[in-house]
Amino acid sequence: MDILIISLKSLGYSRTHKSLDSGPLVVHAVAGAGKSTALRKLILRHPTFTVHTLGVPDKVSIRTRGIQKPGPIPEGNFAILDEYTLDNTTRNSYQALFADPYQAPEFSLEPHFYLETSFRVPRKVADLIAGCGFDFETNSQEEGHLEITGIFKGPLLGKVIAIDEESETTLSKHGVEFVKPCQVTGLEFKVVTVVSAAPIEEIGQSTAFYNAITRSKGLTYVRAGT
């Protein structure tokens, strides 16, 4: 565990007051904070670590084991579970739990370490996320492209993500192909359009909105309200 804690501190994670003797090590980080990248480097440098995820696993590689689906843990290895908040029945076999609690807050635990800074999310999008009530900031130098209009006052471009049932119904009636936020967890797209039946000022601290808008790594469009 010492290697992991040293790594977290070097990456800028902040320590809470929770005792390290209380259960598995819990680590929280916002979208784009480099959590998965840090875990990949950890298992590449230290073969005694095993990392599983309840999200999207890495593709098979000849260079490294990568982040895998939950399965057997080699005897003596330090086991880490990423995206632990997606299920509360799988975590007992692991010594450390990682997640972005904003993606599934109902199953989140009190953390030992946390990181509120993204390195991927553009400034305009980060400001919008923070304005919706999330503790979120970014170190990205990209201003980014963010456009906010009513649902039918702008084109629906790229990956269209509907964040509520009313917007799903509206898009279906017009024959628009879309996905739900839960279908794109851990994925990123160059162009994303987030569709909400409620206007942007009424969305608030919505898990669905957070999951949707943080999938964009390029052009971001929000079609909210009428």
Curated annotation (Swiss-Prot):
Its main location: host cell. Residues 116-226 form the (+)RNA virus helicase C-terminal domain. Pfam families: Viral_helicase1. It is found in: Host cytoplasm. Keywords: Host cytoplasm, Host-virus interaction, Inhibition of host innate immune response by virus, RNA-binding, Suppressor of RNA silencing, Transport, Viral immunoevasion, Viral movement protein. It comes from the Viruses. InterPro entries: (+)RNA_virus_helicase_core_dom. One of its GO terms (cellular component) is cytoplasmic viral factory. PROSITE patterns: PSRV_HELICASE. Residues 1-115 form the (+)RNA virus helicase ATP-binding domain. Transports viral genome to neighboring plant cells directly through plasmosdesmata, without any budding. The movement protein allows efficient cell to cell propagation, by bypassing the host cell wall barrier. Increases plasmodesma size exclusion limit. Acts as a suppressor of RNA-mediated gene silencing, also known as post-transcriptional gene silencing (PTGS), a mechanism of plant viral defense that limits the accumulation of viral RNAs. Belongs to the Tymovirales TGBp1 protein family. TGBp1, TGBp2 and TGBp3 seem to act together for cell-to-cell propagation. TGBp1 is the main movement protein that physically cross the plasmodesma with the viral genome. TGBp2 and TGBp3 would facilitate TGBp1 function. Homodimer and homooligomer. Interacts with capsid protein. Interacts with host AGO1; this interaction targets the host protein for degradation, thereby suppressing the antiviral RNA silencing. This is Movement and silencing protein TGBp1. The lineage of its organism: Viruses, Riboviria, Orthornavirae, Kitrinoviricota, Alsuviricetes.
